[in-house]
Every structure is written in C-alpha cells, then in structure tokens.
Design a protein with these regions (language model features):
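Active-site flanking residues adjacent to catalytic metal/cofactor-binding acidic residues
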Residues: 37, 92, 112-113, 166, ...
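Conserved beta-strand hairpin/beta-sheet module of binuclear metal-dependent hydrolase folds
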Residues: 2-74, 173-190
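Short aromatic-enriched loop/helix-cap "lid" or pocket-rim segments at secondary-structure transitions
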Residues: 8, 47-50, 122-125, 196-200
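Solvent-exposed loop/turn segments at secondary-structure junctions
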Residues: 2, 43, 94-96, 117-118, ...
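Metallo-beta-lactamase
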Residues: 42, 62-97, 104, 113-165, ...
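Metal-dependent catalytic neighborhoods of phosphoester/phosphodiester hydrolases
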Residues: 100-106
Length: 203
C-alpha cells in the first residue's frame, strides 16, 4: 500500500486528501507458462525499513506500508510456486512500486516497451524521482522482449500487452481473457480513480 495526496492523480482536485492505493501484482497461470504483471515494491522497504532503501524524501512522499510476507516471492510461495517457475514478467512501467523486484526473476523473459527501458535506465532530470535504479540495475543482462506498441504475447488473444503511454513514456497495460471470468483489463497506473475514467486526467 502507498499513501499519498489524491491531488497528484486528479490534476489537483481534492488536493490535500490522503488516500491509500494498493500496490497490485498479478500471477497468471497460463498453459504456455506462469506470468506476472508487475513485481511490486522492493523487499527492502518492508517492515518500516523504507528510508534505508528509498531515502527519506521518497518515503515521506509515498508512505509505503508493506510486510515482508507481502512481497511477490512470498505470494508465489503461498500459491505453490517459486520465483524460478515464472516464465514471463510483464512490467507495466519501471516506477518504484511496480518494478521493485525485477531482479528476483533472472530466468524469466521480461516484457517491456523499448521507450520504458530507455526512460528508466537513462531518465530525464524531471523524471528521476520515481525510478529507483538499484531496483533493476543488475537486471540489464536479463532476457528482454522489447516492444514498440501492442503485442499479443501468445498469439491467441489470451494475453495482450497494450501500449498505454502517458503516465510514463512506455507504460503498458494487460488484457487477459479468462475462461470462467471473461476479459480483464489490468491498467497499471493508466487509471487511478473513477474521476480519471470520467475524464479528469491523472496529474
């Protein structure tokens, strides 16, 4: 969970109102291999240890709340998997609450937009704050599937990566077709609040 000012997300409407936002990670068991959408906040910010990893400024701004047993490797264990079972990691974008544990998955194929990789490893000055390079600096030699737009991951329409740039230069969302549930749209940070969907663009 992150806690921060709603005004950041609604072009300063309701500024000063502090909301809690879940840090979502998704485990998708597909016949072609186990897939993750986002890896959440780094394990190092767990149990009140944020400042030693993110620094005081980021911790004060985002106020993360995370127990060690809420990190993605522990969630995988709860469902009977290990980090080595993961075949694909689709990362919505490289911000600190979405790409924090990429380095846990050296055996996976990492699916990202080319523009996002460039923005994360060589960020512009005004974009640097939410990219934590040490989250993924040791992942430079991982196996990347670098995209330039939408992509049908398995070629059957069951998992489609959608280019939803805006929040970052290479933000991507995921459309997943489930047999019993139907089609789900995993938006990442493309839509935060009902106001965004109604036309109030994210701040």
């Amino acid at each position: 969970v992150l806690k921060f000012d709603k005004g950041w997300l609604t072009a300063m409407r309701d500024v000063g109102k502090i909301l809690e936002f879940p840090v979502a990670m998704y485990i998708i068991d597909h016949p072609r291999g186990l897939l993750l959408y986002d890896t959440g906040m780094n394990a190092a910010v767990s149990d009140g240890k944020c400042e030693s990893y993110w620094g005081k400024g980021l911790c004060s701004a985002f106020m993360p709340i995370q127990r060690r047993d809420q990190v993605i490797d522990k969630w995988l264990e709860k469902f009977g998997y290990s980090v080595d079972d993961v075949k694909y990691v689709v990362t919505s974008h490289m911000h600190l609450d979405h790409a924090g544990n990429m380095e846990m998955f050296p055996k996976a194929v990492h699916v990202l937009q080319k523009a996002e990789l460039k923005a994360a490893w060589w960020p512009e000055k005004f974009q640097r704050a939410a990219f934590v390079l040490k989250d993924y600096d040791n992942a430079r030699d991982f196996n990347y599937l670098q995209l330039d737009g939408d992509f049908d991951l398995f070629g059957d329409g069951s998992v489609v990566v959608l280019d939803t740039k805006g929040h970052t230069q290479g933000h991507q969302s995921l459309m997943v077709k489930l047999k019993n549930t139907g089609t789900l749209f995993l938006a990442g940070d493309a839509v935060y609040t009902p106001e965004n969907e109604a036309g109030v663009i994210p701040g």
